[in-house]
């Protein structure tokens, strides 16, 4: 499971097994350690985020904080996604 970066006590990462065909580029965010019930954000072609799910039940304030941090690091996310999976597509 590639860990892309850390924001305070939150890990932003993607799973090594992201299904076949490969899902569009996205990351999971979890406090403490990666978990299967993490919150998921799609990365759009324009570099913005879309909330795919909030399985971690974070507050709107926390979701906004995570979304902004993910958008600020979109280039790193996309680079690491391509390095790991060798291909990329976008949700929209």
Regions found by a protein language model. Give the residues of each.
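Low-complexity, intrinsically disordered short peptide segments enriched in small/polar/basic residues
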Residues: 1, 40, 74-75
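Short, charged/polar N-terminal "headpieces" of proteins
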Residues: 1-25
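Surface-exposed loop/turn and secondary-structure junction residues enriched for glycine/proline
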Residues: 4-7, 15, 44-46, 53, ...
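A short, structured beta-strand/loop element
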Residues: 19-60
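Acidic, low-complexity intrinsically disordered segments
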Residues: 54-92
């Amino acid at each position: 499971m590639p860990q892309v970066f850390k924001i305070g006590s939150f890990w932003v990462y993607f799973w090594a097994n992201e299904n076949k065909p490969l899902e569009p580029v996205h990351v999971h965010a979890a406090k403490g350690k990666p978990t299967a019930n993490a919150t998921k954000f799609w990365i759009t072609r324009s570099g913005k985020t879309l909330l795919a799910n909030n399985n971690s039940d974070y507050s709107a304030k926390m979701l906004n904080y995570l979304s902004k941090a993910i958008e600020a690091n979109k280039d790193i996310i996309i680079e690491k996604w391509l390095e790991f999976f060798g291909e990329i597509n976008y949700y929209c």
